[in-house]
Amino acid sequence: MAPWTLWRCCQRVVGWVPVLFITFVVVWSYYAYVVELCVFTIFGNEENGKTVVYLVAFHLFFVMFVWSYWMTIFTSPASPSKEFYLSNSEKERYEKEFSQERQQEILRRAARALPIYTTSASKTIRYCEKCQLIKPDRAHHCSACDSCILKMDHHCPWVNNCVGFSNYKFFLLFLLYSLLYCLFVAATVLEYFIKFWTNELTDTRAKFHVLFLFFVSAMFFISVLSLFSYHCWLVGKNRTTIESFRAPTFSYGPDGNGFSLGCSKNWRQVFGDEKKYWLLPIFSSLGDGCSFPTRLVGMDPEQASVTNQNEYARSSGSNQPFPIKPLSESKNRLLDSESQWLENGAEEGIVKSGTNNHVTVAIEN
């Protein structure tokens, strides 16, 4: 077996250690709460009504937590579609060229029909040498998964999976139900934690589980709260974790808010338009993960006119780094109804706005 193959196998095995740790803690918490607290402690003191209420509520949070955690782990990260791969002839020409300018020229021609509106910091086409494809907007190569991931947020060791377009909603729900699960356990255990701590109750076996259960649930609640709050802020801004540290580069320069459509629309991009699915770990995110609508940038009429002329002149040249027409020309429901397509030639697209004198800096999905 080659050393690299052996290393990858070991890496995959070790990657499941954090997941097994979380699984062990969850299984133990289930036993400690249901058996030691509800059955032996609360039901043993003849508090039957409280036992039933606690068990029903606990299992509701437990099922939603396990469901969302399972979906986050076992939902395969979405990869770029075949349109973003170079053809055999393009790949052959690209590999034969040693000049970076010539290589970029090949990539620019290949990207003309793709919905790509961001570049690298050096204004070059974002190309993955390992996957041999042109990276869609917001996609990045994950070294742990060894593939390009659509709208990659981060690789999470606690789920042993990449968090991206296909499972980001599940990841957020996993954090939410983790918080609710830990909060419910800590709040309902607190009464008996105090009784055991003050020796009002003397069952030594249940005492250990109840005391430890309170500390563990409170600790996890505090740690997950900060992470969940941070990701709620990211969703409101329509950013990924990667984009929060390194803003995407558009034709006019880096812009951390380039994909922001407003807080409400940003949330709907992740959770979808159907509110009945928002709290369920069922995929309902909008879009295909390969292209995304961008915000409208306000300009005065003279500046907008000059910008339109410059964009038209650049699109006519052979060195245009951005595509002229996306894969799909269907109007995205997230954008304002004022924005519309105006076809100018066979492959030219200029987006125009009505009363607010806005100009889009990137074409929507």
From Swiss-Prot:
Impact after mutating residue 271 to A: Mildly reduced catalytic activity
Q: Which residues lie on this side of the membrane: Lumenal?
A: 36-53, 191-207
User: Is Zinc included in the keywords of this UniProt record?
Assistant: yes
Q: Per its UniProt entry, which superkingdom is the organism in?
A: Eukaryota
Topology Cytoplasmic: residue spans: 1-14, 75-169, 232-365
**Key word Mitochondrion present:** no
**What InterPro entries does the record tag this protein with?**
Palmitoyltrfase_DHHC (IPR001594), PFA4/ZDH16/20/ERF2-like (IPR039859)
Explain what the record says happens when changing residue 153 to A: Loss of catalytic activity
Q: Which residues bind substrate?
A: 135, 140-143
Impact of changing residue 227 to W on the protein?
Loss of catalytic activity
Any one GO molecular function term: protein-cysteine S-palmitoyltransferase activity
Query: Residue limits of the DHHC domain?
Result: 126-176
Q: Which GO terms describe its biological process?
A: peptidyl-L-cysteine S-palmitoylation; positive regulation by host of viral process; protein palmitoylation; protein targeting to membrane; synaptic vesicle maturation
Which membrane topology term applies here?
Multi-pass membrane protein
* Site annotation Important for selectivity toward medium-length fatty acids: residues: 29, 181
Keywords of the record: Acyltransferase, Cell membrane, Cytoplasm, Endoplasmic reticulum, Golgi apparatus, Host-virus interaction, Lipoprotein, Membrane, Metal-binding, Palmitate, Phosphoprotein, Transferase, Transmembrane, Transmembrane helix, Zinc
What's noted about post-translational modification?
Autopalmitoylated (in vitro).
The entry assigns this protein to a family as follows: Belongs to the DHHC palmitoyltransferase family.
The UniProt comment on domains reads: The DHHC domain is required for palmitoyltransferase activity.
Q: What protein does this entry describe?
A: Palmitoyltransferase ZDHHC20
Q: Which organism is it from?
A: Homo sapiens
What lineage does the source organism belong to? Eukaryota, Metazoa, Chordata, Craniata, Vertebrata
Gene encoding this polypeptide?
Answer: ZDHHC20
